[in-house]
């Protein structure tokens, strides 16, 4: 059974490349890469990122946690995030429409968040991230 989605194909069938819905919704970790293009639909990177950093005393389970890639400091995490926004900027020229970073906060054993799970530590340099995001937003106008 195939159920149509108003948002994107990822929600209606397991193979997100099937031509249903209004979006081609790809998920790629960790780097934002679009490995397919569909001229008939919005091309969306529904998930990318997963930049991990274990912040001691701010993790769900000390002995069990992961990220798609691991770093050891706020600067390293921020640098990687900025690198990814530069990659997004390059994708816009090729017809890219949107992206969703995974994830805003750590979730249980996943340490991929921009903040710790209890939201007490912001793991990135907010000013640099804000500037990088603004550059992307301005390029879409």
Can you say where each PLM-predicted feature lies in the sequence?
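Single conserved hydrophobic/aromatic residue that forms the stacking wall/gate
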Residues: 1-13
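Alpha-helical scaffolding within the catalytic cores
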Residues: 14, 26-39
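Residues at the C-termini of beta-strands that transition into short coil/loop
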Residues: 15, 27-28, 47, 118
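Substrate-binding clefts and catalytic carboxylate motifs of secreted carbohydrate-active enzymes
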Residues: 33-141
């Amino acid at each position: 059974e195939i159920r149509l989605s108003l948002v994107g194909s990822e929600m209606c069938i397991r193979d997100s490349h099937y031509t249903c819905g209004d979006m081609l919704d790809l998920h790629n970790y960790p780097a934002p890469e679009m490995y397919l293009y569909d001229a008939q639909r919005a091309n969306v990177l529904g998930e990318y990122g997963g930049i991990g950093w274990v912040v001691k005393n701010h993790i769900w389970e000390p002995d069990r946690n992961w990220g798609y890639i691991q770093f050891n400091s706020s600067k390293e995490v921020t640098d990687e995030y900025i690198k990814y926004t530069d990659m997004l900027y390059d994708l816009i020229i090729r017809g890219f429409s949107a992206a969703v970073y995974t994830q805003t906060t750590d979730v249980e054993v996943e340490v991929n968040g921009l903040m710790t799970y209890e939201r007490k530590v912001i793991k990135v340099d907010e000013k640099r991230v804000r500037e990088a995001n603004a550059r992307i937003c301005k390029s879409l106008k």
